[in-house]
UniProtKB/Swiss-Prot annotation:
The keyword Amino-acid biosynthesis applies. GO terms for cellular component: cytoplasm. It is found in: Cytoplasm. The keyword DNA-binding does not apply. GO terms for biological process: L-proline biosynthetic process. This is Gamma-glutamyl phosphate reductase. It comes from Cyanothece sp. (strain PCC 7425 / ATCC 29141).
Amino acid sequence: MSVTATPVNLTELAHRTRQAARDLAGLSPTARNQALEAVARSLENASDEILAANQTDCRLATETGLAPALYSRLKLDSTKLAGAIAGVRSVSQLADPIGAVQLQRELDTGLILKRMTCPLGVLGVIFEARPDAVVQISALAIKSGNGVLLKGGQEALHSCKALVAAIHQGLASAGLNPDSIALLTSREETLALLELDQQVDLIIPRGSNAFVRFVQEHTRIPVLGHAEGICHLYVDQTADLEQAVQIAIDAKTQYPAACNAIETLLVHRAIAPQFLPQLATALQALKVELRGDELTREIIPVAPAAESDWATEYSDLILSIKVVADLESAINHINTYGSRHTEAIVTADENAATTFLHEVDAAGVFHNCSTRFADGFRYGLGAEVGISTHKLPPRGPVGLEGLVTYKYQLVGQGQVVSTYSGPSAKPFTHRDL
């Protein structure tokens, strides 16, 4: 059982992964859930080794000057690891995604059509830093009967090896073939993975804007994901200002490197003179660098915001602020500069909230709460493989439902199409069952 794929032809590796995934998909839901529990226990037993491996990655990252946003994603402490393990167990409690009947219809007596959910097959997941993504994605793949080829960034290599070794140990202890989860370890394998359009069914990139765009532009395999996380918080004229300050603090500082952290704050001009000084005091105490438009700078002393700031994902303790004339102006700004990820309004006006929720074009639109809630675990999805900002589903945080497709099953008793065509054609009953 090898953690890495370096000595193996990737096409052959993908074939082995698919075969193991087919075996996994054929298991009962109980068996797959037992495998997840075995993986969770194995990760707990290997916690010291995993955290030590991550410390090695973090030390090397510091020596090489890794960007702060990436370092934040790379660092894996005991709390984050425990949360990832809890996510594995929560996935085991979710409904089985395989074999669900989406449609059942009688075409004629004794001719029954069903549409049934089934695994996608083999996933290729490429991510920067984010070693906890190994745990999330592996759990969802096991539950949904998919195989996965994991390719982490070189900065997370030791962490990924330790995590996948523990996952393999858990699968083996449950009597399952660990080949359904494979780890690629060299940079050259990233491009090679993107070329496996006959062996890999879906690519899921997780990382920076430039990274995701690179993946999208270098593969013929369908890609699930988002390139940017430019999220906004709009504070309306009827907002509870104390509540708005707390939401802004959480949405910007709770995890600034997250793709659902806000990058721009929009404030209604009627409350800006009262609200902005409160906000600035709170955020600057937390070391947030503030940039503002001209109207903002007339109220609080901050650096000027350039046009490019409205289209920038900082992934850091930096926030751009703009004073807007009204709700319509806020919505127009968001629909112009937003990345269709997650947008929020703070207001006591239900009509304003309804307008915002209906007219803002994003995968997630929130009222009186932080954008940081846009997360598969917090949505009750168990975990997520990523967030999609595409218009076609799946959209938003993607959990199990995004890892299955469907097939049509038609069961008859010798029927042929000629019976239902021509001048004496027998009519279909088309009766939903």
